[in-house]
Curated annotation (Swiss-Prot):
A motif (Kinase interacting site) lies at residues 2-13. GO terms for molecular function: cytoskeletal protein binding; L27 domain binding; PDZ domain binding; protein domain specific binding; protein-macromolecule adaptor activity. This is Protein lin-7 homolog C. PANTHER family: PROTEIN LIN-7 HOMOLOG. Forms a complex with CASK and APBA1 or CASKIN1. Component of the brain-specific heterotrimeric complex (LIN-10-LIN-2-LIN-7 complex) composed of at least APBA1, CASK, and LIN7, which associates with the motor protein KIF17 to transport vesicles along microtubules. Can also interact with other modular proteins containing protein-protein interaction domains like PALS1, PALS2, MPP7, DLG1, DLG2 and DLG3 through its L27 domain. Interacts with DLG4 and GRIN2B as well as CDH1 and CTNNB1, the channels KCNJ12/Kir2.2, KCNJ4/Kir2.3 and probably KCNJ2/Kir2.1 and SLC6A12/BGT-1 via its PDZ domain. It comes from Homo sapiens. GO terms for cellular component: basolateral plasma membrane; bicellular tight junction; cell-cell junction; cytoplasm; glutamatergic synapse; MPP7-DLG1-LIN7 complex; plasma membrane; postsynaptic density membrane. The gene is LIN7C.
Length: 197
């Protein structure tokens, strides 16, 4: 665990654990299958994604703030990590350069529509498309450390527009919810059209 005022860096700890696993394998004291399985997990993209999200969520809190605030940040980071480990679509950190060209994606949803905020479209040839880290159907969880969960659409738009240099997004892939949302919006549009005729 990091000392007070020190950022959480789990990568070093994971590397050390892998070194110790390799040493234990060479000793022959433990069946190699179990050690190799654990080593594969620690070296997996999944574990790396969980680590990134944990560190990112933990970093959003001011280190000099109260113990309660730090504990809350640690709890949120732990929940994100456990959600990922239980097979839920795990959150990922995506960093995009912010240029005059924009970010190359559209969002939909928000509190006023009683839905999460989603990436509804990746613009072909745009920054997000060229980067490849975002997918249509990604739920937007935070923008540069500011949570947009349960927020109005406009807040997410403002945060995205205000970003300079780079924008750091935390997203989670949940395409079924996006499909349900789009279907609901299409039904609402159809009902409006019928009322107008």
């Amino acid at each position: 665990m990091a000392a007070l005022g020190e950022p959480v860096r789990l990568e070093r700890d994971i590397c050390r654990a892998i070194e110790l696993l390799e040493k234990l394998q060479r000793s022959g004291e433990v069946p190699p299958q179990k050690l190799q399985a654990l080593q594969r997990v620690l070296q997996s993209e999944f574990c790396n994604a969980v680590r990134e999200v944990y560190e990112h969520v933990y970093e959003t809190v001011d280190i000099s703030s109260s113990p309660e605030v730090r504990a809350n940040a640690t709890a949120k980071a732990t929940v994100a990590a456990f959600a990922a480990s239980e097979g839920h679509s795990h959150p990922r950190v995506v960093e995009l350069p912010k240029t005059e060209e924009g970010l190359g994606f559209n969002i939909m949803g928000g509190k006023e529509q009683n839905s999460p905020i989603y990436i509804s479209r990746i613009i072909p040839g745009g920054i997000a498309d060229r980067h490849g880290g975002l997918k249509r159907g990604d739920q937007l969880l935070s923008v540069n450390g500011v949570s947009v969960e349960g927020e109005h659409h406009e807040k997410a738009v403002e945060l995205l527009k205000a970003a300079q240099g780079k924008v750091k997004l935390v997203v989670r892939y949940t395409p079924k919810v996006l499909e349900e949302m789009e279907s609901r919006f299409e039904k609402m549009r159809s009902a409006k059209r019928r009322q107008q005729t």
